[in-house]
Amino acid sequence: MAATMMGVATQTREETEPEAEPAGPDIRQYVVVDRSLGMSAGKVAAQVAHASVAALLAGTQRYVEGDPTCGPIGLEWGGSLARTSVDAGVLAEWVRQGEPKIVLAVDGERALAALVSRAESRGFMEGMDFFCIRDACRTELTPDASGSRWTCVGFAPMVVSAISPVTGQLPLYR
């Protein structure tokens, strides 16, 4: 109900705020970085960015190649409707929640490998649920025998309760 102050009608806060949408499950995207590499802040940011977009780009690539299991995300790319392997409902809720990302840390490639092993033991698949990011070593890092360096693992956006058994014990990257 509008209140009157000095002859001017005003609306109460309850009248002007839209009703909050019901809260969906917490959805986050996790990226786990190997901090033992001593990357600069800019290099870490670039590697996390690669990991963050990998889920959408990998799914989009599968759609372009004709994989019918990818769900629509409503983006046009190359004249086609882009699709991703991320569940459309999860993706929509993640976007609604502000696309939250959490960056965690491990120390060393063995720790990254252990993380991948935990993920696979829970049924997660590389190239669909998580992405191993390797740097081309053109700027800061020294390549390993493969000619690149494994820097991080990025997970597709997912319900926190699904990913917590894999990442829950890891510290935040600082």
Predicted regions and their residues:
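Positively charged, small/polar-rich N-terminal and surface patches that mediate targeting and assembly
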Residues: 1-174
